[in-house]
């Protein structure tokens, strides 16, 4: 299946009221694209890392009342899940799409990974592109732009990952809905590949 960019109708899904109606809209408009992204980039990540990667499309199965405000496909080296490992995500909120590498609170190795990242603090500050953003909570759309952080700020959020049980850390890019109006499918694929290329050093640090 051909990889397709996200369109305005995909972002509008998150304005649909009600759990059942919004989930039906997600399944109709977004999940087929996430499946295609999953197929494409699980192979890409396997090729880039030499490890088998598997993709996991968010099903939101535990939701009983409140509809999801975002959705995604995640990539990890575990066929059964991704939350317990450093992983990659591609997804969207109503306000933006995102491409991330991260560790969320269910990951038991996040303390060890945080200490490894701290050893490379100056490299992270220098080498991560200025248009990247950091998230400390995957359930919220708020982020910290990399170009606004000093090394001490970066150190603080990485140390928090190690010391706070519920702490998380994700890094990557946001793409505004209007950017997709002039983005071809091929350009979207290239954007994802270049973002993953910039994030792979962090993956390698966290898995050494």
UniProtKB/Swiss-Prot annotation:
> Which Pfam families is this protein grouped with?
DUF1054
Gene3D superfamilies for the chain = Protein of unknown function DUF1054
Name the source's superkingdom: Bacteria
In terms of InterPro entries, this protein maps to: UPF0637, UPF0637_domain_sf
Q: Which SUPFAM superfamilies match?
A: YktB/PF0168-like
Q: Which family, according to the similarity comment?
A: Belongs to the UPF0637 family.
The name under which this protein is listed is UPF0637 protein Bcer98_2662
């Amino acid at each position: 299946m051909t990889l397709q960019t996200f369109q305005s109708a995909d972002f509008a899904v998150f304005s649909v009221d009600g759990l059942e109606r919004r989930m039906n809209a997600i399944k109709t408009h977004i999940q087929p694209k996430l499946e295609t992204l999953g197929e494409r980039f699980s192979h890409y990540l396997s090729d880039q890392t030499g490890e088998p990667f598997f993709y996991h499309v968010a099903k939101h199965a535990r939701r009983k009342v409140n509809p999801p405000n975002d959705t995604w496909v995640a990539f990890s080296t575990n066929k059964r899940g991704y939350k317990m490992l450093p992983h990659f995500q591609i997804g969207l909120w109503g306000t933006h799409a995102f491409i991330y590498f991260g560790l969320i609170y269910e990951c038991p190795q996040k303390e060890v990974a945080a200490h490894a990242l701290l050893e490379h603090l100056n490299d992270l500050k220098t080498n991560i592109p200025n248009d990247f953003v950091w998230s400390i909570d995957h359930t919220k759309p708020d982020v910290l732009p990399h170009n606004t952080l000093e090394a001490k700020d970066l150190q603080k959020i990485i140390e928090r990952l190690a010391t706070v049980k519920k702490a998380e850390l994700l890094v990557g890019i946001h793409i505004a809905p209007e950017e997709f109006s002039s983005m071809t499918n091929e350009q979207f694929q290239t954007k994802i590949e270049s973002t993953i290329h910039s994030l792979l050093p962090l993956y390698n640090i966290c898995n050494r």
